[in-house]
Each structure stands twice: as C-alpha cells, then as structure tokens.
Amino acid sequence: MVGQMYCYPGSHLARALTRALALALVLALLVGPFLSGLAGAIPAPGGRWARDGQVPPASRSRSVLLDVSAGQLLMVDGRHPDAVAWANLTNAIRETGWAFLELGTSGQYNDSLQAYAAGVVEAAVSEELIYMHWMNTVVNYCGPFEYEVGYCERLKSFLEANLEWMQEEMESNPDSPYWHQVRLTLLQLKGLEDSYEGRVSFPAGKFTIKPLGFLLLQLSGDLEDLELALNKTKIKPSLGSGSCSALIKLLPGQSDLLVAHNTWNNYQHMLRVIKKYWLQFREGPWGDYPLVPGNKLVFSSYPGTIFSCDDFYILGSGLVTLETTIGNKNPALWKYVRPRGCVLEWVRNIVANRLASDGATWADIFKRFNSGTYNNQWMIVDYKAFIPGGPSPGSRVLTILEQIPGMVVVADKTSELYQKTYWASYNIPSFETVFNASGLQALVAQYGDWFSYDGSPRAQIFRRNQSLVQDMDSMVRLMRYNDFLHDPLSLCKACNPQPNGENAISARSDLNPANGSYPFQALRQRSHGGIDVKVTSMSLARILSLLAASGPTWDQVPPFQWSTSPFSGLLHMGQPDLWKFAPVKVSWD
C-alpha cells in the first residue's frame, strides 16, 4: 500500500496517554476488589517487542518467525521471506482519515500457527492505535470508570459459558471445517491479545480467551443486543438509532454493478483502518484440504478488531458482503439468546466469508448457531454471476439474509435487483415476517412511517436519488448525501425544529440543536452519524480495490471538528481535529 506519510504528535499525545493511563490505573485499584476480572485499563504500548521511548513511525513492517530449536516465535522488523506471518501498517489518518494494514501468512506452516501469528504481528504493528481505540471506546465498559455490576457479571458469565461451549464443540468435532475456522478465529484473537500484553506463547491444545479483554473490541455489534437480552439498565441504545446505509446499483445497460456502504457510529470510533488479509488457511484441519475460497479479503475496520464490524468485505472468492443493522424491538425474542448452542455473530461472519464461494452457501454457513445478536440484513453480491451488459442471470448475483433472535430468512433477490436496478438497505427489515416478528409494527403505530420499510426517510431518498448514480463518483455523492436543511424528505414533522440531520443517507446527528424537542432519542443531538463511505465495482473488486472516504459527511453541511463541536470533551485520542477528507482509491501492490 502506498500512502502519504504521517508522524504522530509525540509530546502532546504522550502526555494525553500518560494522564489517561494513570487515571485508569487509579480507578482500577479502587474498584478492582468489587468486580474482579472485568474490563478497564490496558497497559500503554511498550511491551517486550515495542520500541520503548520512541515515537511510532508513520509506517511499520514486522514479521513473526518460528525458532524451531527453541520452540518460540520471534519478532523481527521488516518483511522476512521465512515469516509465519508479516504485516505492514501505514498510518495516514492525519492526511486521509485512514490507516492501512496489509497482513499475510505463509502456507508452509499449519493453520493454527498461522492464525496465532497473524494476531501477534497485527498487534505488533498497530499497538499504539489499539491503545487509543480502546481508551476512546471500551475503557468505560464494565469498569474501571463506570459499570453496572449486575449486568457486567451476567455478561461475563454469558461470554465464559459461550467460550466454554465453543471449546467443547471444537474438541468434539476435530474434523469439522466449520469448527476448524472457529478455532482459527479465536486463535487469531488470542495472538492479538498475547502480543499486545508481551506474553507470546503459542497455545498447544486447549486455550482460553479473556471474556472482557480484547474480545470486547470484537463484540461491539453483538453487545447492542446482549445489553438488552441481559437486562442492562443504564445507557440503553437510542430508540431508532441508525447503523449504516447501503446501496447496490446496476448502472445503465447493466454495464457495471456498484456496491456501496457507509457506517453509522459514535464519533469516538473514528480511528479507522482499512485492512487486507492474505491468510493461507485450509478449509479443514488436514493438509489435503484446499485453501479457503475467501483467503484474500479487504475490509474496513478498527484497531485491534480482526473483522470489519461495519460490515463491508471484498473477498477473493468474488463475493462482496455487507450489512446494515435491523436490531430487535420484540422483548419476547430475547429468550433465544443463550450462551450454549450459539456462535456470536462476529465469528459466524468471519467463518462464512472464509468458507463460502456463493451467496447461498454463505447464508447456509452464517445461519448455523444463530446467536440472535448483532441482528442485521446481510447482502451477498457474487460478481462471478454478474455479466456486464447482459440480461439478468435470474439468480446468484444478490442474496439477502435477515437475522433476528430465533429466526433467519434468506432469499435470492437477483430478479428484483434487475427489475428495480437497485437494492437499498437502511436498518429496516425487508422481509415481512422479520419485520413483524421484530416488533416494528408497534413502532409504526406509535411514530408513523419513520419506522416503515417503504416510508422511512432513507427509503424515500434512495428511491428518489438512486437514478442519479451513473459512476463511482456519483455513487460516493449519494452515499455522502445529507442536505437536511433543504430536503423535504429530511423533515421530522413532530420535531422542533423540523429539519433533522438523522434523516439522510449519511447522518449528522451532531448538527441537531441540543435544545430541540424530538419524539425519540435517535433524532436528538448526538455524537453520532455516518463516519465513512466505501464503494467498489466489478473491476475494482477483482483486484480487492475500492474508493473510501473517512469521517462525517461534509458535502452539503459543515465538516465535523472536535474542538468546535458540543462533544469536544469526549476522549478522541489519535483523531484529527478537523474531519475534511476527500475519497481515496485504495489499491495494493
């Protein structure tokens, strides 16, 4: 990856990190006796493989080697030809809003060693970003700053039981490709955490994952539903809060098929990394298995997170997979969220991306062991089935999957895509059975069309504006669209004032007045909105390339700036003050 160079602001950042760490450690000592084993402060970078006292470079490359005689993994700078795993990080966040991570493993070593080493080397090149992302987003979750003891103990017990059940399944099904991939996923996470903590030791046989360690960085989506299922009473999710917009668009004459996604999130999550993994994993645990179809992948992500979480993936199998969150508003369904018999969503999406070569297979793999957490509408685009300039193949180009607790519905939507020329996704289920079961009918009855599939603001804006998409640039413009002060479709009739920054393809809830009146929480002023856009095409996906812009939209509204915003007091380590970045083309050597 060739990117602009970026140097960390050494002394200022160091002071901020020192203050935050000191406070975290003091509070950890105060609350530790009351709530053992829960999350909180993690050590600042400076483990045995870190360069103590040095400002981290804008670009860093490292390799993990196997010392056969000593039976140990060793870290060296640069890319070594005999590496078990290697990684290169280019930090261009100050220039583009993105860091770029490229990571690969060697098929000369077994899958388990590759997976663990992949986690080890990722932490080694990105430890400063991991620390800052943790402090920005996770340090307050279940201590030491603030916590809800009953909920946190229930969450810890749930995760421990779930990890134990998965360990039992891995041991009971040693020949299973599915459980082989689950094990590799957890080993990669184990390597990431061990490396960051400076205690690398490849686990032979059974191994453990801390329930509230770096697992929390993977769980941000699953936690949205675990909080409700486990009766968290403080700081519940905002009713109606959007989480991503997506558009799949056939260009005129079926000349191309564009796939676009923007992530909606809290602005403290804007330390962003676009990652490329090239993992030489086999489908099953034995050497005669072929490589997984999705062994090459590019995805938008975050420091310390080994999957997308947005989610947006371009896969070497010819698939592009993405989702928007639909959630669950029916409390009666939380009974299906159980620690045993389920695999949490972040793991299932990794496994499906690796093993599937078409949409139907992806759906079959993903829906196994439905956890009922991180409930999403998934779109699986298969570019292998798309014929540029040709008629509809009838099937396989677009598969739609929707998950809620106790239910997964799948359908091929290729014919509908070709009939309408687009598929839009905006956090509302498209399947009537899912819509009704998830409790949205009651919200429509209470609040009107804002919660309906056809009448919500984004449904109407997509329907009106999708025909304006003629190429990559116009797709980016639509996905960054927010003209809430002038667009009648952005009005909230029950709000005062009526124009609302949430009612757009890329939300800017920070622009809503703090003293306004709003019928539900999502329409209020919040440090939340669309924080990126990613777009690919048939030709770009073939080479794992995309266009990407980072940060809240600033096309029709002022750019977001921390120092002048109502949220300047929120921790945002490592982030630029002013978010005003143009799209960049992401390509790889």
Swiss-Prot record:
Keyword set includes Disulfide bond: yes
Function, in words: Putative phospholipase.
Glycosylation site list: N88, N110, N231, N436, N465, N515
Family from the record: Belongs to the phospholipase B-like family.
Any single GO BP term: phospholipid catabolic process
Tissue note: Ubiquitously expressed, with highest levels in heart, brain and liver.
Signal peptide range in chain numbering: 1-41
GO molecular function, one term: phospholipase activity
Keywords annotated in UniProt: Disulfide bond, Glycoprotein, Hydrolase, Lipid degradation, Lipid metabolism, Lysosome, Signal
Cellular component annotations (GO), alphabetically ordered: extracellular exosome; extracellular region; lysosomal lumen
Disulfide bonds: C142-C152, C492-C495
Name of the protein this chain belongs to: Putative phospholipase B-like 2
Origin: domain of life: Eukaryota
Primary residence: other
Post-translational modification: The p76 protein is synthesized as a 80 kDa precursor which is then processed into a N-terminal 32 kDa form and a C-terminal 45 kDa form.
Binding partners and assembly: Interacts with IGF2R.
